[in-house]
Amino acid sequence: MICTTGIGISISANKVKGIRCALCSDPLSAKMTRLHNDANMLAMGAGIVGENLALEIVETFLNTPFSGEERHSRRISLIEEV
């Protein structure tokens, strides 16, 4: 999802049950949110990241699997209970 900053859409998206939306402005954030939080939606700000960087962020997000580590799985379970 894209808006000017990405903040509002990420907040709104996270109100939907089952959505774990992460606001990312760099590839490392995209990688870590997939690895550790199993984020299933990406938010970006068009006024924050340029086109080439946005493509790199999306590619990283889509190509990074969830780590499956127990501590990360527990975290996701706690998030889902909220």
Language-model segments: what does each one mean?
Residues I19-D26:
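Short hydrophobic/aromatic-enriched beta-strand-loop microsegments
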Residues M1-V16:
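Glycine-rich phosphate-binding loop
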Residues I9-I11, C21, I48:
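Short, flexible micro-motifs
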Residues K17-I19, N37:
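Short, structured coil segments at secondary-structure junctions
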Residues I2-C3, C24, M44:
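Structural motif
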Residues P27-V82:
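C-terminal binding/interaction regions
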